[in-house]
Amino acid sequence: MLVKQDDLFEISPSGLKELEPYQVKRAIIMAAGFGSRMLPATKDTPKPLVEVNGKRIIETLLDALVAAEIKDITIIVGYQRQQFKSLLANYPFLKFVTNDDYVNCNNISSMMKVLDRLDRGTYICEADLYVTNPAIISKYQYDSNILGYYCQETTDWCFKLQASYVTDYRQGNTDCYNEYGISYWTKEDCAQLRRDLAVIYARPEGSQQFWEAVPLKWCQANYQVRLRECQKEDIVEIDSYQELLQIRQKQVS
């Protein structure tokens, strides 16, 4: 599968052919929410469109996806949804799906709007992650996995590992892995997700669930989700207006 050229090894044409089934070609981006913790920056602007260091937050993710040759990208919008159309100037291939239920429901309601898009291997990403290492979006994926980094203690959503697979998904823990909002799901697991999301959403209070809790907690037995470990600095999570100001100040100084 490898050929040597000018003292460098490259994947041969036959090797690339073998990799084709594992090439990721689709991504879904969750961008419907209000981002209340970022007020006043989000008073008139969706959090993913807030500018940091000369670039809008979502553009760092979009650029990473494009670098991995992924252009089948659907963005689920809600709050100030018309503003996302400005992205088409640089990313004309984007598709938009509206979720007006974001006001009263959790992000599982966004996934319910794109069940028909879960018919092949797919990245599912949060839109408000400031990606500093584009390499975390890999062109090829071989199994379902979720991005995370090790931490001794956290109050955020996290998980532990059992034989390299995600277990004990909860908010807050010690000696665990902090969840980053980028995951990949195989074609087979996407089909399972379609079924499980619909089942959980139909339950009382189902609309108040985080979608990630469906495969990682409520229906965990149906999946084997591997950790794809990254470094904390690969993504900057901006969870408050104060954190936004601090990052902008670092850029100025």
Identify the meaning behind each predicted range.
Residues 2-29, 55-122, 205:
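Conserved N-terminal catalytic core of the sugar/cofactor nucleotidyltransferase
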Residues 4-27, 180-253:
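Conserved alpha/beta core of the MobA/IspD/sugar-nucleotide pyrophosphorylase nucleotidyltransferase superfamily
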Residues 18-52:
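Glycine-rich N-terminal loop/short-helix segment of MobA-like nucleotidyltransferase
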Residues 31, 77, 126, 148:
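Short beta-strand/turn micro-motifs composed of small residues
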Residues 37, 60, 83-86, 113, ...:
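Phosphate- and divalent-cation-binding pockets in alpha/beta enzyme and binding domains
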Residues 48, 93-95, 224-226:
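Conserved beta-strand segments of alpha/beta enzyme cores
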Residues 121-130:
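Short beta-strand-to-loop acidic/aromatic patch adjacent to the donor-nucleotide binding site
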Residues 132-205:
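Conserved core of the sugar-phosphate nucleotidyltransferase
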